[in-house]
């Protein structure tokens, strides 16, 4: 586990959302070369070092934000977004937003605020949450037009010397 860079949340978040009980900050982190996240926003990010990994396999929204959020294999969120006025580039903004939403998904910990408080303050992550709720669960893996496994049936016409196979597609 390696800390990469410290990120301080924009100062105006706390000013516009008084429910936030402290000045938020986090670290961009990697674990075995992959982006990793602190899932409890009000706690300090652990120091760099060796830690046992915990697998979270029963939380659909955590899976989705790790998959579709910053650094995920199907990242589609926060591209082209940067809080430049707050000194954050696109990667830092994507990491920060993914961290906030993962903390909400995992522990509900938003340093005293909730998603509606952030929305009223103009932070606007509620629509992202709702969008991700509608995305496919990445744990389902591939499925096919024939079900969970590809079912291929080939036939051979000896008279015309033609083999035919049914068409199977990914869903």
Can you say where each PLM-predicted feature lies in the sequence?
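Charged, long alpha-helical assembly modules
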Residues: 164-171
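Short, surface-exposed polybasic-aromatic patches that bind anionic ligands, especially phosphate groups
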Residues: 1-158
């Amino acid at each position: 586990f390696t800390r990469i860079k410290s990120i301080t949340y924009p100062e105006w978040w706390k000013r516009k959302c008084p429910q936030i009980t402290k000045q938020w900050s986090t670290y961009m982190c990697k674990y075995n070369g992959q982006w990793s996240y602190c899932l409890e926003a009000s706690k300090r990010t652990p120091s760099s070092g060796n830690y046992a990994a915990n697998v979270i396999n029963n939380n659909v929204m955590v899976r989705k934000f790790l998959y579709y959020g910053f650094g995920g294999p199907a990242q589609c969120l926060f591209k082209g977004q940067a809080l430049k006025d707050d000194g954050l580039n696109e990667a830092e903004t994507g990491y920060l937003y993914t961290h906030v939403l993962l903390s909400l998904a995992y522990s509900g910990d938003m340093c005293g605020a909730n998603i509606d408080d952030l929305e009223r303050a103009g932070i606007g992550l509620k629509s992202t949450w709702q969008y991700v709720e509608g995305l496919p669960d990445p744990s389902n893996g591939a499925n096919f037009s024939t079900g969970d496994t590809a079912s291929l049936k080939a036939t051979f016409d000896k008279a015309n010397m033609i083999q035919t196979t049914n068409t199977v597609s990914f869903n």
